[in-house]
Amino acid sequence: MEMERINEDTIRVVIGNDDLNERGIRVLDLLGNHKQIESFFYSILEEVDVDHQFQDNDAVTFQVLPNRNGLELFISKNSDNLQDTIAKATQSPDQSDDSDSQDDVSDYLKRKLMQTDTNQVEDGQGIAHNPTKDTNDLDPYLDDPDTPTKEYVLKFDQFEDLVSLAQLFRPEGLASNLFKYRDQYYLELVFFVDQSSTATIKDDVAVALEYAHLANISADVLLEHGEKIMSNAALETIRHYFK
């Protein structure tokens, strides 16, 4: 774990996957457990804030930027300029300012990790709209409960298999939901049948099954007894952060 003082109001903490494993935490686990998030954040703050300049401040805020190697945690006692500070600290010299798709997914993860106030509607089962522009054209289908769909639930032996699938699996007319149940990850694929042919759906599922198994459990059971970590655009979100 590395700590850098960005300015008098902000600390950046780089936490690698090894550090997370030692604490028994994975990035995606944080998305579904608000109490675990808060406990984790304050444990990091206690370690790095040896002068107690932040711990004694009621206005302290946190923001997380997950990546494949772990995550960056920004701790600030002045949230007004936090976004600008993070942008300057993380933007490479050749990085374009045109990062709409990154902002879309970052906002999604920020809402899930920080439970910030937004006008977005949360239903207790995940966010109500897509986090990336990749799925914006599916909004009419997602909003219509009568839309004909075909669903498959996949179970992964390890999270890395899910990451590998997300990198190459880009079907048209698909929504994807990620669940965690009994320490296993499950992915629900929801195909909109008027967006894909039966043959195409069959081929897409065959590709997915190279990385996973068909699960003998329904999405309804996962929703009731497990955790829904990502809604509608799980594949896009994983693809973005685990490159």
Curated annotation (Swiss-Prot):
Q: Which InterPro entries match?
A: MecA_C_sf, Neg-reg_MecA
**Region (Disordered), start-end ranges:** 119-140
Against Gene3D superfamilies, the record matches this protein to: 3.30.70.1950
- Superkingdom in the source lineage: Bacteria
**Molecular-function GO term, any one:** protein-macromolecule adaptor activity
- What is the role of this chain? Enables the recognition and targeting of unfolded and aggregated proteins to the ClpC protease or to other proteins involved in proteolysis.
Q: What is known of its domains?
A: The N-terminal domain probably binds unfolded/aggregated proteins; the C-terminal domain interacts with ClpC.
Query: Which HAMAP family does the UniProt entry name for this protein?
Result: MecA
Cite the record's note on assembly: Homodimer.
Family to which this protein belongs:
Belongs to the MecA family.
Supply the name of the protein.
Adapter protein MecA
Q: Which organism is it from?
A: Lactiplantibacillus plantarum (strain ATCC BAA-793 / NCIMB 8826 / WCFS1) (Lactobacillus plantarum)
